[in-house]
Amino acid sequence: MKTPIVAAIAALFLLGANAQAQAPSDAQIASIVVTANQVDIDAGKLAESKGSNAQVKAFGKQMVTDHSGVNKQAVALVTKLKVTPEDNPTTQSLKSGGAENVKNLEKLSGAAFDRAYVDHEVAYHQQVLDAIDKTLIPSAQNAELKSLLVSVRPAFVAHLEHAKGLQSSLGQKN
């Protein structure tokens, strides 16, 4: 079950490591933002339908709502700026890690599903925050793109804290 988590986290670690060698362009950052949010939307939809714990289901629904909102903001901004999101190794790794996570979650049910979903959310949000802080914000050249990243950061912090609280209530401490 840890494989998709490792793949998604590895993509974000690579992003941080690559930032030292070559910072991502604004077009690549836009693609990373949309992809990272879509990965969490897909997992959230599954949690809404498959979660056995009411709090896990509600958290999944919140992830779908919040991350869909961020994607709408990102798409509106890149449209306004006439920037075409550029696929890159980080987005490819995020997509494959996200698909693998959903595939593995689909095999689980009950409390095992709830724990696996929440564990992934804790790890994923921590790594997304690290990428936002260490790579995406520092690398963004466009002031509006940088502003978007700064403005959505508190929601990622709140999601991480919420997921940690759920993790604790489910008896998991990672």
What are these regions (language model features)?
Residues 2-9, 13-174:
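His/Met- and acidic-residue-enriched segments that coordinate or traffic transition-metal cofactors
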